Regions:
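Short, flexible loop/turn elements at secondary-structure junctions
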Residues: 77, 98, 149-151, 166-168, ...
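Short catalytic/ligand-binding loop motif for oxyanion handling, primarily in non-cytosolic enzymes
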Residues: 58, 81-84, 100-105, 113-114, ...
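A long amphipathic alpha-helix within ATP-dependent nucleotide-binding catalytic cores
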Residues: 140-144, 187-246
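Coil-to-beta-strand transition motifs
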Residues: 68, 157, 166-172, 228-232, ...
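Phosphate-binding site of ATP-dependent enzymes
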Residues: 88, 113-202
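C-terminal active-site "lid" helix and adjoining low-complexity regulatory extension at the edge
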Residues: 239-281
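A conserved helix-loop-beta module that forms one wall/lid of the active-site cleft
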Residues: 28-109, 116, 122-136, 144
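Membrane-proximal basic amphipathic "stem/tether" segments
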Residues: 1-43
C-alpha cells in the first residue's frame, strides 16, 4: 500500500535503480529506458489508453488499416462468469484487455481446464496493471476479457509475432521472441532483416534461422501508419500464411526497465526518441 502512494516519478526512480542498478536521469534523459520513463510521466496523450486496450484498439486498427487485418473476435465479457464454455469453438484464445501477458490458449476444448483458466483471468482482472511499473496507459482501461480465433500457420511452426520499434512514425528495429515457454530467447533485426549483435532483456541466438517474412514490407508500412506522430511505440504483427494480422501496441517495452547488452546501444536507441513538450506534470 505504501508503494502505491509514492508519486510516480519517485517510484520510477527507485524501481529503475533496483532493476538496473543505476540512476535514472529524468532531467536529461539519454538512454532508451530513461526516455521511456520520461514519456510515462510527461507524454500522456489520452489516445494512448485506447491504443493499449486490447479491445478498444480494434477500432483504431479498423480506421487506420482495415477490418481484414484484425484477428477475428469471438466475444468480449466483463467477467469469467459471463462466459459460456459450451458456446466457444474447439480452439480459441482468451486474453485480458487491460494488461500484458494474461493470455490463455485453448487447442482442444474437450480437455481444456476452464477452472484454471478462469482463475488466472479472474486474478488478472482484479489487478490494475498501472502500478507495477507506473505505465499510466493501463490505469484507466476497463478490465475485460476477449476471445479471439486461434490462428495457425500452414507450416505448423510456432506462430511468431514481429515486434516493430517505431520512433516518430519511422520503423527502426524488429524484435522476434522464441521459446517463450521453455527457454526464452530474443533476436533483434534491422528493417532490412539483418540479424543484429545486440541483446535486449533476453539472450540472442544467432544459430536460430528465422526467415524474413514475405510480407515484411507491408508490416513496416502498417507500423509507420500506426505510429505516426508518436515519439516511441512498438507495433506487433503476425504473418500467417502470407497474410498480415495486427497483434498489439506497446508503449513501454519491458516497462522501461529492460537490460541491454551495452550502454552504448541503449544510448543509440535513446537518440531515436525525440521527446515532445511535456503534456503532464
Amino acid at each position: 500500500m505504501f508503494m502505491k502512494k509514492l508519486p510516480d516519478r519517485k517510484y520510477i526512480e527507485m524501481l529503475y535503480y533496483v532493476r538496473l542498478g543505476e540512476h535514472c536521469d529524468l532531467n536529461r534523459p539519454e538512454t532508451f529506458n530513461e526516455k521511456l520513463n520520461w514519456l510515462k510521466l510527461y507524454d500522456r496523450d489520452p489516445k494512448y489508453t485506447k491504443m493499449a486496450d486490447k479491445y478498444e484498439v480494434r477500432e483504431y486498427i479498423r480506421e487506420k488499416l482495415g477490418e481484414e487485418y484484425l484477428i477475428p473476435l469471438i466475444g468480449v465479457w466483463d467477467s469469467t462468469k459471463e462466459i459460456d464454455p459450451s458456446a466457444l469453438p474447439e480452439k480459441f484464445v482468451l486474453k485480458c484487455t487491460h494488461d500484458s501477458a494474461s493470455v490463455v490458449i485453448c487447442r482442444d476444448r474437450a480437455s481444456f481446464d476452464f477452472d484454471e483458466a478462469f482463475r488466472k483471468l479472474d486474478e488478472a482482472l482484479s489487478r490494475n496493471y498501472f502500478y507495477p511499473a507506473r505505465e499510466w496507459v493501463y490505469k484507466d482501461i476497463r478490465p475485460r476479457i476477449i476471445a479471439e480465433e486461434y490462428m495457425t500457420d500452414e507450416s505448423g511452426t510456432e506462430l511468431k509475432d514481429y515486434k516493430i520499434f517505431n520512433f516518430g512514425g519511422k520503423p527502426e528495429l524488429i524484435q522476434v521472441d522464441f521459446g517463450r515457454f521453455v527457454h526464452h530467447e530474443r533476436n533483434l533485426y534491422s528493417t532490412e532483416w539483418k540479424l543484429l549483435p545486440e541483446t535486449f532483456e533476453y539472450p540472442r541466438n544467432g544459430s536460430v534461422q528465422i526467415e524474413k517474412p514475405e510480407n515484411l514490407e507491408e508490416m513496416l508500412r502498417f507500423a509507420a501508419i500506426l505510429s505516426e506522430g508518436i515519439p516511441s511505440v512498438r507495433t506487433d504483427f503476425y504473418s500467417i500464411n502470407g497474410r498480415t494480422y495486427f497483434g498489439e501496441i506497446t508503449f513501454y517495452q519491458e516497462g522501461g526497465f529492460g537490460h541491454f547488452s551495452s550502454k552504448e546501444y541503449a544510448e543509440k536507441l535513446g537518440e531515436l526518441i525525440k521527446l515532445p513538450e511535456k503534456k503532464h506534470e
